[in-house]
Amino acid sequence: MAENSSNTASGSHRREVKRLIIMRHAEADWGLNDFDRPLTKRGHEQAAAAGAWLASRGYIPEQIMSSSALRTRQTTTWVSDGLGAKAPTAHLDEGLYEVSASRIIARINSVSENVHALMVVSHLPGVQDAAQRLMSPDSDLNASMDVYYGFPPSSIAVFEVLGEWALLDGADARLVDFKSF
C-alpha cells in the first residue's frame, strides 16, 4: 500500500493509505422472500466480471464482510472467483442485511487496523448512503456523480482512507473509482 508522509510539530509520522471497497450485490431474482433471493444468470456474470475488474485494477481486499442474505453470499462467491487465489475468505455478517449507512460504517469502524484493504458487500439503500456519506471533498468528480445518480446491482465504489478504520465517519474517505457491471 502507498504511504503518505506528513510533518507535525511533534515530529514526522507516516499514515498508511487504506482501501475500502463498497459493493452492492449483483442482480437478484424476485418471487421469494427477500433474504433468500438468489442471483439471476446475469447476476452471476456481473459478480464474476466485478471480481475480474477488481483484480485487474489491483483492488484486492484482505478482508471481505458480506451480508448473510443469499444474493450477497453468491455475489461474494463469484467476486472471489474473479479475484482468484488472492481472494480472502468472506466473513458473513447478519448485521449487513437491511442496514443503514450508519450501521455499515459502524461495522467498518470495528475492523482491525491491521487490515489495509477491506470490502463490504451489502444492499440498498445502505451501500449508496454509506458511499455518499464517506466521500471527501477531494473525491473523483465523475465517480462521485455516479454514486449520487444511482448504485445499480453489482456496483462498486472504491475509496482511499487515510487514517484509522475506527475513526471513519463522514466526508473522510476519497472516492477514487466507481464501476457498475
What function would you assign to each model-found segment?
Residues 96-114:
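Short phosphate-binding loop-to-helix
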Residues 20, 117-119, 156:
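Residue-level preference for the first positions of well-ordered beta-strands
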Residues 135-176:
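Domain-level recognition of soluble alpha/beta enzyme cores
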Residues 32, 130, 168:
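Residues that scaffold the ATP/ADP-binding catalytic core of kinase and kinase-like folds
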Residues 2-3, 11, 15-99, 127, ...:
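Active-site-proximal alpha-helix that buttresses catalytic centers in soluble enzyme cores
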Residues 57-59, 111-116:
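Glycine-rich phosphate-binding loop signature in dinucleotide/nucleotide-binding domains
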